[in-house]
Amino acid sequence: QLIGATPTVSPTPTPTPSATPTPTPTPTPTPTPTPTPTPTPTRPSMSFIDMLRSPVVNGRYPITFETFPTPSKLPTSWEDVYENREGIAYKAWLSISEAAKTSKSSLGTIKVTTGPNTTLPFTDIEPAMSLVSKAFSGAGQPSLVTMIAFNYQDQSWADGVYRQLIASEPDSFKRNHQEYVLDMCSASRKVCWSAMGFTNTAGEGIILLGVVEREKLRTLDPSYSSYSRSEEGLTIAHEYFHTVQRKIIDKNWFRMEFTPPIWFNEGSAVFVENGAMNFNSFDRYMRFRLVDSKLAYPSCGTTADGCITVSEATMTNFLSLSHYSTNWSNFPFGMKYEVSQRVIEVLVAIKGHKSLTDLYTYMAQDHTFEQGFKHIYGISYESAIPLLAKIVTDQFANNR
């Protein structure tokens, strides 16, 4: 018997252990940064008059902290207007505000020519004019308005463009109007810090807009009202309303007896620029109104400081029609603008903002201001003067 070789038993291989995977580390979450809270603007502590004069403080005009409640009582007639005098501004604003919101614009064609070195600080020209147009939608308005905008560097250019524009006008028109561009600029300050709105003999509107660079304007008048006029379009609205005044009264503009006093023309334009451009905010209307009147409050200072003294006596004298012959030239500039705006507010509060253009329409039919006032406002002008003087004086005496 053959003995076979003993088979060699192959050892069972020891399995190579699988490598234990290295666990992926759980990422440490990035902490969500805590947002830095936006600091609540702090209202600067300053006097009433300093607030009106103030430039921007920490990015904001101090006047913009002011808010104004809706008055509970509004005037309805000459009989209750003094008693409810704290509601005059709101009632007047409400009248023009509603029309600017809801009425249809009658704005004609607008042509804007800007100097080669001039940058407009406000560019929504047509929308600004359109708000005024809507507010007075039933009144006559120019079918064409040409605006020439220029800074001091472009004064000669503007003068040439303007003279070409009026080249076909009669000599009588040129005598009264041809120097306008040159008259608007100050050689000593090197600025054209003014604007003019009027019509030609065909009833087409012309607006001459002096433009002051932002930084230079801040050195001339850093206040909120100056900013609003330049950069929020109030000057555009003001001058467009002047073209409406001239369009309506037409040939009678140069007949003194059938033209309103200069304070009525300018005071109504100040009211309209503010009411139309700030139609959506009574607070904004009141802020501009206060700052624009900064020279007429008692805390302003003396006349030597350029301030205006407002009293019943000065207002009664100012409102006298005996000053027609001198065109009120013996009164401070501000009396014919911001102080007169307060008189206009009273009239609008009683009879509505369209009473302003209604007066021009009536005077265009060869009626005097006294006749027009009685016809539109239902009281003789002489009877209204003491009440108007009393109301306006009370407003300034009480910082309203």
Residue ranges: model-predicted function:
Residues 35-224, 229, 233-234, 252, ...:
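Non-catalytic architectural context of zinc metalloproteases
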Residues 185-302:
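Zinc-dependent metallopeptidase catalytic helix centered on the HExxH motif
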Residues 135-153, 251-260, 280-287, 355-362:
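Surface-exposed patches in mature extracellular/periplasmic domains of secreted proteins
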Residues 272, 292-386, 393:
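Active-site-proximal alpha-helical
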Residues 154-161, 277-282, 366-372:
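Secretory-pathway/luminal and periplasmic proteins that interact with or process carbohydrate-rich
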Residues 118-125, 225-237, 258-266, 330-341, ...:
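Solvent-exposed, acidic/flexible segments
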Residues 7-42:
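Extracellular mucin-like PTS domains
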